[in-house]
A protein has these predicted regions:
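Hydrophobic ligand-binding cavity/cleft-lining segments
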Residues: 1-46, 148
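A generic structural signal for beta-strand entry/edge sites
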Residues: 3, 48, 75-77, 99-103
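Short, intrinsically disordered, mixed-charge
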Residues: 19-26, 124, 128, 139-143
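Beta-strand/loop substructures that line and gate deep hydrophobic ligand-binding cavities in soluble
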Residues: 81-132, 137
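Glycine-rich portal/gate segments that line the openings of hydrophobic small-molecule binding cavities
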Residues: 38-84, 135-148
């Protein structure tokens, strides 16, 4: 099994951070490798929202990585599952208030089956890199105008 997590302290309130991460259309603003993304069905910010996402894979080939929001608790938690593509991890964003800031933790979990278990080390490394992109998310959110 591959597991990775990372956390940052963002100088914004929990609802500002939550509203940003629950909208999958914001992903290209902070995650690298996203070629395209659109809301396929459901409502942005709600459980059941399904996003069609294409990533840049090895050699620049497109890779499907569609995902569905499985839990959306305002100001507290967003969970998702990848429903298309070669790897289908589950993940979540977990928020907690610290003074006037928000601690955001991003966790990914993937249980490869069959021959994919042979790639566990590569998958683990990729997931570690993915969650570490929270540093860019922090910079993007903190660059937004603070709400009054």
């Amino acid at each position: 099994m591959a597991f990775a997590e990372y956390e940052v302290l963002i100088a914004r309130d929990a609802m500002t951070v939550y509203d940003f991460v629950v909208d999958g259309l914001n992903n290209p603003l902070w995650r690298s490798g996203i070629r395209s993304i659109k809301l396929l069905s459901g409502t942005t910010g709600r459980k059941g929202a399904l996003y069609q996402q294409t990533l840049s894979g090895p050699g620049g080939r497109p890779i499907a990585a569609d995902f569905e929001i499985t839990e959306a608790r305002p100001g507290a938690e967003v969970r998702f599952v990848v429903v298309a593509g070669p790897a289908r991890p589950t993940g979540g964003y977990y928020l907690s208030t610290e003074g006037e800031a928000t601690r955001l933790r991003f966790a990914l979990r993937y249980e490869p089956k069959g021959l994919k278990r042979l790639l566990d080390g590569l998958i683990q490394s990729t997931m570690v890199d993915e969650v570490a992109q929270l540093e860019k998310l922090k910079a993007v959110i903190e660059a937004l105008p603070a709400s009054a």
